[in-house]
Structure formats: C-alpha cells, structure tokens
A protein has these predicted regions:
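Residues forming the flavin
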Residues: 1-424
C-alpha cells in the first residue's frame, strides 16, 4: 500500500507487459492495461454493486474455497481499492442482459464499452520480481488429493487457518465441518524427487509446516500433529529453536514419506502407511486430516519474461543469474536484475534481502550519466553482410538488429553486446 501512495512510483495494476526493447539505460516498455469496466479513480468500493450482482463464482484468491461475485476486488488490501468486472462470468455484457450493477452505481463508475489501453514508457533498468507458483498435486495424485476431501495442500490449509479465510481462522474438516483431532503433514510433495515433481528443495516447506504446527498447538492444545519428512532443513537464524519448540509441544516427527493413503468410508479418516526409517518398521497412522506441503515451481508464464528480456533458465526452470556466488542478482542482460523467487525458491527474508540488493544495483545505473561497458564487442563487416538475420536470432543478449526486408546490414548495439562470439 505504501507503493500505491508513493509520489514517485507509478503502479500499473491489472496490467501485462507486451514488449520490451532496447538495452541498459534505454529500455522501452509496452504495457497493456487490461480493462476493468470500472473507473478505478471514481470507485469508492462502497459494495452496493456487489450486493445486487446475481452471479456467484469461485474466488481465485482463496483457491475456490470461497465465492465471489462477477464484480469484485481481487483480494483484501488490493491497490487500487476499486472493483473490476469478470466479463466472462458477467451477465451484463454484449448485449446487456442484467445491468443491475450499472443501475445501482450512483457515481456511474461502470462502463461496459471500456477498452484495453496500451501504455509505453522508457526506463533505465529493470527488476524482475515475478514470483513463483506452487506445485500442483493433481499431477500424480499419489496422496489422494483429488479423491479424498480431507486431503488439503499447504496453501489451502493456510487459507483455512488464517483469520481472513473462509472460516475466520477456525480449522475444520471439509467433510463434516468439525475441528480435527489429528492432522498429518507430508513434506516434500513435488520437491526432492526425480520422478515426481522437481529434484530441488523448495526451501520454505519445512519452516512453513513447523509454523503451522505451532499455531495448531497454540489454539488447539490437545490436537495430535504428525509430520512425515525426509529431512528437516531448519538452517536459518532462529529456525532450529523454532523446530525444538514444536517438538517440545508434542508434535511428532516421523522420518519417512507415506507410500499409501486410504480413506475410511464411514469416518472419512485417512490411513497412512509409512516406513519409519529411524527404526525400519512399517507403520500405519489414522488421521482426521492430511496436509500436503507442496513445493515451489517457476511461474506458468515465466517463459514470456524470458523471451522478452532474452534470459536463460536453469534446468529447473528458474531464471539464470550471471554467477550464483559473485553476481547472484544480475541477469545476463545488462541492466536487468532479479528479486525473489523468479531466480530460485526462497523465503520472505531472502526475497527482501535480494530485492534490496536489486534496488541498489538498479540505482547504480540510474545515478550515472554514462554506463561502463565491455571493450570487447562484435563488429559487422557491412560489405560481407547478406542480411540473413541468423546473427540476430542466435544472439543471447538481443544485441543485434537487422532489417531483412529492407536489406539493411546487421548492427551491433554495443551497450548490450557481451563479446561472447556466438554470432560469429
């Protein structure tokens, strides 16, 4: 919200980047500001339009656990605090078959004839902070996520247990709406596995589960919590103490990942079969609810940013930095920097730290009149150039332009060229 109020920050909410061109110190950005059908300046979020809207659809922000109307604010504390219309769900568009929100709005903020807008501007540097997605457990469904109602993901449990969630913070079972007496947490769902999901550790899952167990024990003292894990990775400042507090409150940590989950057809309880690797025994645990601690994966549209900025990705799909130790914030494209989980899975603390570093790196460019570049750059012999465009296609930095139709020889943008020799 501070960003929305800052006089020197322009916030383009509900927008998508369509094109990026240029180079360090001289990037040109084209943004499509998607139509809201509601004037975000005039709208006061009075809620009267929502009251008369007859359409009810699942609420994306709460993963479908709650409902919203066709006219809605995407999530609490959204900036700007103005409504928008889901035109695919709305009944009042082309032709107007409903129009109740239009009639109810006294300030006449709603305009069904509104259109997308294209905004273009120039910037000196770019910080990529696109975030991440969470692993979809339906991919293999080995833990019965699509078959058993009492199997939830960690994201769904977060919504269920949060004060702003569908139950205002009360943890209940989906099947009978009762507070569970026992909950099991299965770690590394979609992480640390070559055959199912991703081979890497998602960094945040262990501590997120430990936090959930502490909250459960704080509000439900007699609840039985069991955590099934491969390894507990409590490596950060204060993390080990957090882990020990959880164990001291009676949370049981079982070293082993369940190989099978069954549901009791009468009670809807879940029966987990697991090999406890600390004693080598096969155990069965009957639980009221199971939470899948799902891992982090690259955003579904990460390839778009990769293409627009001519970036590379690692084998796991996250954006690749110049050097993991010496330049962990810099992208191979000069003037572009990374912040947060676009580069690798990380928690809030590490994301904030990297974002601060990215802001500082961007300021080093903006505070200078001229930018130092590498002396070694490619050159084009215009007499020999055949205007084929192959050099421009293979350049990993987008540093070469060529007009094939007009037969204009290739030109190297020295500010973007790294002298790698790929074009040669």
């Amino acid at each position: 919200m501070d960003v929305g109020r800052h006089p020197q920050i322009t916030l383009l909410a509900y927008s998508e980047i369509e094109d990026i061109s240029g180079y360090i110190g001289n990037f040109h950005i084209k943004v499509r500001k998607k139509v809201r059908y509601v004037d975000e300046v005039e709208c006061t979020a009075c809620d009267e339009c929502v009251e008369v809207c007859p359409v009810v659809v699942p609420k994306e922000h709460q993963l479908g656990l709650a409902a919203r109307k066709a006219i809605y604010i995407p999530f609490p504390q959204a900036v700007p605090a103005a409504y928008l219309i889901d035109i695919e769900a709305c009944l009042g568009f082309n032709p107007i078959a409903c129009g109740k929100c239009l009639e109810k709005c006294d300030k006449k903020c709603i305009d069904f004839d509104d259109q997308d807008k294209t905004i273009e501007f120039d910037v000196g540097s770019i910080i990529v902070a696109t975030g991440m997605d969470v692993y979809d457990p339906t991919e293999f469904d080995e833990y019965g996520y699509t078959r058993f109602e009492n199997v939830l993901t960690s994201m769904e449990f977060e919504i269920l247990s949060g004060p702003g969630g569908v139950t205002t913070g009360e943890v209940i079972r989906p099947t009978d709406r009762k507070v569970p007496k026992s909950i099991g947490f299965i770690q590394c769902v979609g992480s640390r596995c070559e055959s199912r999901g991703s081979p890497y550790c998602s960094n945040i899952c262990c501590m997120n589960t430990i936090k959930d167990t502490l909250l459960l024990k704080e509000y439900y003292h007699d609840i039985d919590c069991k955590v099934f894990y491969i390894d507990i990775r409590a490596f950060g400042k204060g993390f080990e103490d957090f882990y020990r507090r959880s164990k001291a409150l009676g949370v049981e940590y079982i070293r082993g990942i369940p190989g099978d989950i069954r549901e009791d057809p009468k009670t809807k309880n879940l029966i987990l079969t697991v090999e406890n690797t600390t004693n080598g025994e096969i155990e069965e645990h009957e639980l009221d609810m199971v939470v899948l601690s799902v891992g982090l994966v690259p955003r579904y549209d990460a390839s778009t940013i990769q293409r627009l900025l001519t970036l590379s990705t690692t084998s796991d799909g996250f954006l690749m930095e110049v050097h993991p130790k010496l330049s962990p914030i810099d992208a191979p494209t000069s003037g572009v920097f990374f912040a947060g989980c676009c580069e690798a899975p990380k928690d809030i603390k590490d994301s904030v730290t990297q974002a601060s570093g990215a802001a500082a790196r961007a300021l080093t460019i903006l505070s200078q009149d001229k930018v130092k570049i590498q002396a070694l750059t490619a050159t084009v012999d215009e007499d020999l150039c055949k205007f084929c465009g192959i050099c421009a296609d293979v350049c990993p930095y987008g540093a070469i332009t060529v007009d094939i139709k007009a037969k204009i020889p290739a030109k190297v943008i020295e500010a973007a060229c790294k002298g790698c020799g790929t074009c040669a």
